[in-house]
């Protein structure tokens, strides 16, 4: 299992638009590139962070080579129009060494 953490700064007032684009895009990425899904977190000052899981590094790299260009153009445009230019960054990527999340409690 491979994990990636992303960070964005969203333009004030466009948070719902960003979340809608992110949500639809994440679903397409899972369907088209084999991603295992993601969790989105909202911080202060318009900062959003997502934690994504992939079956392996090769699957993630393949998706990144296409800039994760999935088939939902509307979702991609919502997402792009909501983020501050140049604010996207990959904070971390690497293999999962231990997984102690208890999803039964959620």
Language-model features: locations:
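Active-site-flanking beta-strand signature of metal-NTP-handling nucleotidyl enzymes
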Residues: 2-8, 49
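Short hydrophobic/aromatic beta-strand element in the GNAT-like acyltransferase core
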Residues: 3, 37-38
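Short amphipathic
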Residues: 7, 92-97
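Short, histidine-centered active-site or binding-site loop motifs used for metal coordination
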Residues: 7-10, 54
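Short, surface-exposed ligand-recognition loops at beta-strand->loop->(often short) alpha-helix junctions
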Residues: 9-20
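A short, structured loop/turn motif at beta-sheet edges
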Residues: 12-13, 46, 58
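An amphipathic, aromatic/His-enriched active-site/gating alpha helix that lines ligand/cofactor pockets
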Residues: 24-37, 53-93, 106
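A short beta-turn/loop motif at secondary-structure boundaries
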Residues: 40-45
